[in-house]
Amino acid sequence: MARSVWKGPFVDGYLLKKAEAARGSTRSEVIKIWSRRSTILPQFVGLTFGVYNGQKHIPVYVSEEMVGHKFGEFSPTRTFHGHAADKKAKRR
């Protein structure tokens, strides 16, 4: 079920402060965040966030198409190594 419209998008408070500070500075550096649950807002467009996936921070450059999505969607937490090979097929 989607979030109620009257509540508005969820964003952690510290994330807004970090984004404002990054907008004010001239240096473009990766903003490290742990909040995968926060919604991407229009004021984040053009910034690069390091979204934590449980092991490391994955750099995510925010574009117009990402607005309204969550940060966690762009930082996968699981790695797929493929299914086990069929032993019968290898013998031939």
From Swiss-Prot:
Function, as annotated: Protein S19 forms a complex with S13 that binds strongly to the 16S ribosomal RNA.
Record's protein name: Small ribosomal subunit protein uS19
GO MF term (any one): rRNA binding
InterPro entries (UniProt xref): Ribosomal_uS19, Ribosomal_uS19_bac-type, Ribosomal_uS19_CS, Ribosomal_uS19_SF
Top-level taxon: Bacteria
SUPFAM superfamilies in UniProt: Ribosomal protein S19
One GO term of the biological process aspect: ribosomal small subunit assembly
GO cellular component terms listed in the entry, alphabetical order: cytoplasm; small ribosomal subunit
PANTHER family from the UniProt entry: RIBOSOMAL PROTEIN S19P FAMILY MEMBER, SMALL RIBOSOMAL SUBUNIT PROTEIN US19M
Family affiliation: Belongs to the universal ribosomal protein uS19 family.
Pfam families cross-referenced by the UniProt entry: Ribosomal_S19 (PF00203)
Assigned keywords, A-Z: Ribonucleoprotein, Ribosomal protein, RNA-binding, rRNA-binding
